[in-house]
Amino acid sequence: MQAKTLHIRHLGNQDYETVWHAMQHYTDNRDENSPDELWLVEHPPVFTQGQAGKAEHILNPGDIPVIQVDRGGQVTYHGPGQLVAYPLLDIKRLKIGVRQLVTHIEQSIVDMLKPYGVQAYAKADAPGVYVDERKVASLGLRIRRGCSFHGLALNVDMDISPFQRINPCGYAGLEMVQCKALGGPNTVNEAGEKLTLTFSQLLGYEHLVHHQGLAE
């Protein structure tokens, strides 16, 4: 039954590095009985450069910090008004592979936007979720000891202009879009609530347990 319970952590607005180090700590110290968790958070403005990232894709960061991190993928931007969700899952226990997890994450975003009349889709060759060739959600995962961390960023109601300072996910000229402009969820809380439901349903979790803040 353990694998059928998902713990949701509502972290509010938290510094990127604090949450990143907490994810690493949780993943490094978990065992076969540790619960799966989904962390929901907003970050202050920051560019994060994944392991495949190339310096030339960071065009003009200006006063926004750039952090080199241990996830897959290239450079992306996080900022207020964006829902960031980190699934900390034992994928061995769930009996799914990395590609399946990526597909489930993308599909959970597609499914949550559908009731708003937003026709979103994933692309086989470019992880993330798109609407009319514009990117609404970015993805970057890390698997360690059969467990996932890092995750997804969904643009909800934010200033998307900092994306113009980079080649998002390594694609020059890739246009970003956000939920509010599409008629989707207007707030990070609303988006988090809807995403939690579609994500947990797709992965077969039967019970959700909610927590405020990081574990002590």
Swiss-Prot record:
Parts forming coiled coils: none
Domain of life assignment: Bacteria
Binding residues for substrate: 71-78, 138-140, 151-153
Pfam families named in the record: LplA-B_cat
Gene Ontology CC: cytoplasm
EC number in record: 2.3.1.181
Subcellular location: Cytoplasm
UniProt-annotated site: Lowers pKa of active site Cys, residues: 135
Additional comment: In the reaction, the free carboxyl group of octanoic acid is attached via an amide linkage to the epsilon-amino group of a specific lysine residue of lipoyl domains of lipoate-dependent enzymes.
Family note: Belongs to the LipB family.
Protein name: Octanoyltransferase
Top-level taxonomy: Bacteria, Pseudomonadati, Pseudomonadota, Gammaproteobacteria, Alteromonadales
Gene encoding the protein: lipB
